[in-house]
């Protein structure tokens, strides 16, 4: 909005030229989202607490300490993140950029699926919400619509091609399979973040780290000069997604203020599915789907731990981990919750640095 209102006046008022800069608007979106989520946080949390009464149902088969320590904490805190994120993006982003609208569509669509899941859990006072197959169906519908839109706005030769890290010019043409591949990235990213969201502050910081990394990537791939210098594929228009990433970080920081141990509110599926879907959509738009697996490696580890645990138990009757997802395994080994959280944050930073290194190591 401000880009259109004030950027167009830059010819008459030189100072307004800053609204044309993606970096300035990214910073503005970050601060705006932080202030909104921070200031409205207490009211939203109080409302959630009043409506939910007993708070988020705690898994009886999970760590027993959670039943005692986390009982009564409200969920759906992702709504607080979205309240900070969406207005900030609309205020600071270029409304004519179609990538921004596509990622917003994915974010709100997955957020709606998560909200339905959280609502059923709270209303039924049960950890079981929307059936898994139903949830996946709607997630894939949203993701496939987004993929159709992303292919429409992309240009040849990148429309349905997969770029490979460490290789300058290598493109793997996927054709029609690219729609399914991209949808898998978006849905997989969404559910991987969802599985990671099991301890106070555990998911939101790695999400912000991934958003910061992707924000830098979209800024570089969306700039012809930087893309040519780094010898990465130039994707026109994706630079505007840096504003979205900035807003996500700001909203995440505001949420973390209330989600830090001991949490006053849980993110819930409303937040985890929305944020994970957003990260996946941004990676697909920037043609860095495989790099997302490195940057978001912590989410991959959490998801794989669940897959391995379930497969092993069904095939052999034995469990590989003491409990899945992975963070619960370390809790069962005797690690304190803050220890697990901070160490997983460190892993996220290291993996993000490794992912960003692929921009130069070619």
From Swiss-Prot:
Cross-referenced InterPro entries: Glycosyl_transferase_4 (IPR000715), PNAcMuramoyl-5peptid_Trfase (IPR003524), PNAcMuramoyl-5peptid_Trfase_CS (IPR018480)
Membrane topology: Multi-pass membrane protein
Family annotation (Pfam families): Glycos_transf_4 (PF00953), MraY_sig1 (PF10555)
Single biological process term from Gene Ontology: cell wall organization
Reaction equations catalysed: UDP-N-acetyl-alpha-D-muramoyl-L-alanyl-gamma-D-glutamyl-meso-2,6-diaminopimeloyl-D-alanyl-D-alanine + di-trans,octa-cis-undecaprenyl phosphate = di-trans,octa-cis-undecaprenyl diphospho-N-acetyl-alpha-D-muramoyl-L-alanyl-D-glutamyl-meso-2,6-diaminopimeloyl-D-alanyl-D-alanine + UMP
Chief location bin: membrane
UniProt-recorded Gene Ontology molecular function terms: metal ion binding; phospho-N-acetylmuramoyl-pentapeptide-transferase activity; UDP-N-acetylmuramoyl-L-alanyl-D-glutamyl-meso-2,6-diaminopimelyl-D-alanyl-D-alanine:undecaprenyl-phosphate transferase activity
Transmembrane regions listed in the UniProt entry: 28-48, 73-93, 100-120, 134-154, 169-189, 201-221, 241-261, 264-284, 290-310, 339-359
Necessary cofactors: Mg(2+)
Entry keywords, A to Z: Cell cycle, Cell division, Cell inner membrane, Cell membrane, Cell shape, Cell wall biogenesis/degradation, Magnesium, Membrane, Metal-binding, Peptidoglycan synthesis, Transferase, Transmembrane, Transmembrane helix
EC number(s) given by UniProt: 2.7.8.13
Role according to the record: Catalyzes the initial step of the lipid cycle reactions in the biosynthesis of the cell wall peptidoglycan: transfers peptidoglycan precursor phospho-MurNAc-pentapeptide from UDP-MurNAc-pentapeptide onto the lipid carrier undecaprenyl phosphate, yielding undecaprenyl-pyrophosphoryl-MurNAc-pentapeptide, known as lipid I.
Protein name: Phospho-N-acetylmuramoyl-pentapeptide-transferase
Organism of derivation: Parvibaculum lavamentivorans (strain DS-1 / DSM 13023 / NCIMB 13966)
Origin organism lineage: Bacteria, Pseudomonadati, Pseudomonadota, Alphaproteobacteria, Hyphomicrobiales
């Amino acid at each position: 909005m401000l880009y259109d209102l004030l950027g167009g006046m830059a010819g008459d008022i030189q100072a307004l030229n800053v609204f044309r800069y993606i970096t300035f608007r990214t910073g503005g979106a970050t601060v705006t989202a932080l202030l909104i989520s921070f200031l409205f946080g207490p009211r939203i949390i109080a409302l959630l607490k009043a409506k939910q009464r007993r708070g988020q149902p705690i898994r009886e088969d999970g760590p027993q300490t959670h039943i005692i320590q986390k009982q009564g904490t409200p969920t759906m805190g992702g709504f607080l993140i979205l309240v900070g994120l969406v207005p900030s993006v609309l205020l600071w982003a270029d409304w004519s950029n179609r990538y921004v609208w596509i990622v917003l569509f994915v974010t709100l669509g997955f957020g709606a699926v998560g909200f339905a899941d959280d609502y059923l859990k709270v209303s039924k006072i049960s950890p079981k919400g929307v059936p898994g197959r139903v949830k996946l169906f709607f997630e894939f519908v949203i993701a496939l619509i987004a993929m159709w839109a992303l292919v429409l706005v992309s240009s040849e030769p990148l429309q349905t091609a997969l770029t490979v890290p460490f290789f300058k010019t290598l493109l793997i043409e996927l054709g029609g399979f690219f729609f399914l591949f991209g949808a898998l990235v978006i849905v997989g990213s969404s559910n991987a973040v969802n599985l990671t969201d099991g301890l106070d502050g555990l998911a939101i910081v790695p999400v912000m780290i991934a958003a910061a990394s992707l924000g830098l990537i979209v800024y570089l791939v969306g700039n012809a000069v930087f893309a040519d210098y780094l010898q990465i594929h130039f994707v026109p228009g994706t630079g505007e997604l840096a504003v979205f990433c900035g807003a996500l970080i700001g909203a995440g920081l505001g949420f973390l203020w209330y989600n830090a141990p001991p949490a006053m509110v849980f993110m819930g599926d409303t937040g985890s599915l929305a944020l994970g879907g957003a990260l996946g959509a941004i990676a697909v738009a920037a043609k860095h789907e495989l790099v997302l697996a490195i940057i978001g490696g912590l989410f991959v580890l959490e998801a794989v731990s669940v897959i391995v645990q379930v497969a092993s138990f069904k095939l052999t009757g034995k469990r590989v981990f003491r409990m899945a997802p992975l963070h619960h395994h370390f809790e069962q080994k005797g690690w304190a919750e803050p220890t697990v959280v901070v160490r997983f944050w460190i892993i996220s930073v290291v993996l993000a640095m490794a992912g960003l290194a692929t921009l130069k190591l070619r």
